[in-house]
Structure formats: structure tokens, C-alpha cells
């Protein structure tokens, strides 16, 4: 008898209760260590446990495959508008993977619209028949975004199972009543006068350093994303966590030798979060199986990076607790002190673990959003000299001297704000948002099965001809057109999402981005680098909207 046969026989001999429990554990989208420990405590050890676990895993794969194929074969969405039936195994996976971000649905929408039909969504499948809907109808988007967010169970939960393994149970990931508790505690810190004061005193100083570096290296090719990420990283460190990343020193080092690339930020939080997000075949396989939590048990490298990340975030929390100087207080300090009147005394404040998870969450979400927004704003200025001059005229009108622009002045610049809104429309940092149907739904006469993944393609909605006049044209003036604005659906412009779960940091991002862009545009004429001439920009999306190749510019100091 070979080993495989012996293992199978041993597995068949073990308790049916174990197998039932094991399949129940693996098949749920919420499976985690609690269920795993429960199984391991059922009394089996040695070869029996190994054989049973192996058999259980095989059974899970077979039954999941059969269930997925049945859903795929008899799905009510097979005849819905979209890409039509594809391979069960691959679906549209490779088309979406290989094409620029959102290009397949944009092309599909153009073809379907020629028939004059109303297209409320585009249906498609990915690996192993997994159902997806790209929502295009603003009423449907409103329905999803405005569904009550603080109830258990939620009507349209997020189920960000992979992100949860890296950032933990922060505000972006938690669901239902637990999300409501977090939001009530955290939100006052982002609406406080403290935040505006902190932005006003922190950002101009960091931008002054950037301007000085660019003046010293005028005419040199600048990697836009890398340089702006330096600024926004230091901002979120100081304002949100009272933490010094000291990233800006890399700009000064680069100025001494601009032919070299920027160095890496020497901080354990940054290095460990990059390692935790790195891709691997194991990560892809576990994501497909909807069991990403297993990675920390199967991958020593991921386990190490996650432990280092948690340790670095824990240290930031503890250091913030020890701050006595009022001038060094941060958003994190306000979150530590905040209380929720609707929770019990034992639950009315965030625990140290919850604070740690919020640190990781705000670093990933806040840092990327602002740097991406500023990045695309400067790209537009480099490619549209006519708009650059209009922005410059608005800036000099409100800031005629050579002083650094502060937030109070930037708030008065109406054309600048229209320009930045138009940048958000065509180059929204958040390109896509996901939800999942908790139960069967009816969308515009189509039956939507429970467990269907809903994709809200902000990048596509902001370019949809049903919602925008001349959608591909970059026109800041449209934001002064009150008639056009009054006709536009309120959910046609959603750069920070909408409803109860909108981005809590949008005020933070808006204040910071305005100061950065205004000061750069005031001090420099911005041009695309010669290396960019003749190259086509294609979009990609990971955390925020990126592109290939990376944008490079050069600047010429004004007057």
C-alpha cells in the first residue's frame, strides 16, 4: 500500500464530525484561526490528523470547484450585459491582467452603447467562475454606498480579506457595528481644528525644502511619484502619528547627485509594509481559494514581515503616548483620548491593538491618496501649458509676493480648486471600490446572486458619457458651470467614495494637496522630461492609480 492510499484510508477512518467541521471552516468567507484552533482541539494527533486534514482539503477543493461550476453554469447573469460567457477556469482574468487599467470595460461599453441600450452594469467572471459586476448606473451606486453601514450583517460588505492580513482591523476593513464604533471614535480627530492647524504648520515647511531642491537641480529629470511620496510620507508621519520618517533628507541627498535615483526610506514601518504587500505564487493561490489568512502559517517570510510591521506600528503608538509637548501632538493622540458614548465603558476607547491597526491603515490609505493626487495634477500642468498659465494666474492673484503659499491663501484660489477637482475626475487616486452582495438582489430587473462581487469603477464612472459632457476633455471650467452641475447625478463624482463609508481623510488630503500643488506651480514652469516624449501613458492600479512608464518632469524656476 503506497503512502497516498494509506493516507486516504486513514482519512476515511476518522470522525465524520471532524470532516464536517473542516469543510464548514474552509468554505466560509470568514474562516480564521478561531475555527482552526477549534478543529485542532478535537483530539486528533499524529498521522490521523495529517491524513484527515489532507482529505478534508481535497474534499474542500472538489466541493468548492463543483459549487463554483454550478453557479457559473446556471448563473442568472450569463445573459446580462457584459463580456458574455467565457472559460470557467480563467474568465476575464487574463484580459484584465494584461490590459491597461479599465481598458476592457471601456471598450466593451463603447460597443454595447452603439445598440442604444441602457447599460446599468457589466457582468463578467474571473478565476473559477467567480462573478463580478462593474456598476455603471449612478442609482445603483447610490444604493450600494448609502446602504446602512453599521448593521450586522451588512447588505453590501467589503470582505477585504487580503488587506486585513496586512493592515488588521482598521477603519477601511472592519464591518458593521464594529465599523460604526471605530468611526465614531476616529472621526472627530479628522474634523478638528487641530488638523487644519497641523497641516498649516507642517506642509509649507516640507514643500519649501522640495522647492529648494528642485531649484538647485533645475533642468534635471525628476521622478514625480518618488519625490511627491517623500513629502506626503513626512506629512502623515508628523501630523498623523508624531513620527519622524525623515524622508525629506533623501531629497537633499539626491540634490547632491541628481543622476542617481532617490534612496530608500530607512524606517522599519516602511520596509516591513512593503515586504508584507509583496506578491508571491502562494499569495495568489490563497487569494483564489479565499483563505489569505493561511499565508502567515505557510510563509515564514510573510510572517516575519507582518510581525515587524506590527512591532513598528506598536512602537509608534507607545511613543505617541509618551509625548508631553503639546506642539508635538498628532491625530493619533486625539484618537487615543476620544471616547464613544454609545459603547460600554470597556469598549468606549480604542485598544492599543486597534490603534496599531489604524496607524497601518492611515499610512497606506492617506499617504498614497495625496501623493497620487498631486502627482497627476503636476502631470496635467506639464502636458497642458494653457491650463498651467491659468493656474499660475490664479495663484499670483492671491499670492503676489515670493512667500510660501499657506492654506488660507490656497483656499481662496477658485481656479486652482476647479483644476484639482478636474484632476480628481480624470485621474482619481481611488480607481476602484469593491463590495459583495450579502443576499440575492434585483438590479434593474436582473437577479444578482448572493456572494456576487460588486465593483464600483470610479475611473470609468468619471469618464462615462452618460454622466459627463465631453468626458475625455480636461476642462476645469466645467466646475463653474452651475447648469451642468445641477443636471449631474450626485453619485457621478465619487473620488473619495460616498455615503457612510466615504474616505475619512478627504479633508486631510485636500488641504495637503492644495498647498503642494500651489507652491510648485507658483515657483516653476513644469515640463515633461525628454525621456517621456513620444511615449504612451497606460494606467495601472495598485492601492492607487499609477501609470507605465512612470512620469518624469523637469522644472524651470519662474522669474
Swiss-Prot record:
Its cofactor is heme. Signal peptide: none annotated. One of its GO terms (biological process) is cellular response to carbon dioxide. It is found in: Membrane. GO terms for molecular function: heme binding; iron ion binding; monooxygenase activity; oxidoreductase activity, acting on paired donors, with incorporation or reduction of molecular oxygen. Induction: Up-regulated under phosphate limitation and by increasing partial pressure of CO(2). Heme binds at residue 503. It is a single-pass membrane protein. It catalyses: N-geranyl-L-glutamate + reduced [NADPH--hemoprotein reductase] + O2 = N-(8'-hydroxygeranyl)-L-glutamate + oxidized [NADPH--hemoprotein reductase] + H2O + H(+); N-(8'-hydroxygeranyl)-L-glutamate + reduced [NADPH--hemoprotein reductase] + O2 = N-(8'-oxogeranyl)-L-glutamate + oxidized [NADPH--hemoprotein reductase] + 2 H2O + H(+); N-(8'-oxogeranyl)-L-glutamate + reduced [NADPH--hemoprotein reductase] + O2 = N-(7'-carboxy-7'-demethylgeranyl)-L-glutamate + oxidized [NADPH--hemoprotein reductase] + H2O + 2 H(+). InterPro entries: Cyt_P450, Cyt_P450_E_grp-I, Cyt_P450_sf, Cytochrome_P450_Monoox. Keywords: Heme, Iron, Membrane, Metal-binding, Monooxygenase, Oxidoreductase, Transmembrane, Transmembrane helix. Pathway: Secondary metabolite biosynthesis. The chain crosses the membrane at residues 49-71. One of its GO terms (cellular component) is membrane. It holds the Pfam family p450. Its EC number is 1.14.14.-. The keyword Transmembrane helix applies. It comes from the Eukaryota. Cytochrome P450 monooxygenase: part of the gene cluster that mediates the biosynthesis of domoic acid (DA) and derivatives, natural products with neurochemical activity acting as ionotropic glutamate receptor (iGluR) agonists, thus being neurotoxins causing amnesic shellfish poisoning (ASP). Catalyzes the conversion of N-geranyl-L-glutamic acid (L-NGG) to N-(7'-carboxy-7'-demethylgeranyl)-L-glutamic acid (cNGG) via three successive steps involving N-(8'-hydroxygeranyl)-L-glutamic acid and N-(8'-oxogeranyl)-L-glutamic acid as intermediates. Belongs to the cytochrome P450 family. This is N-geranyl-L-glutamate oxidase. It comes from Pseudo-nitzschia multiseries (Marine planktonic diatom).
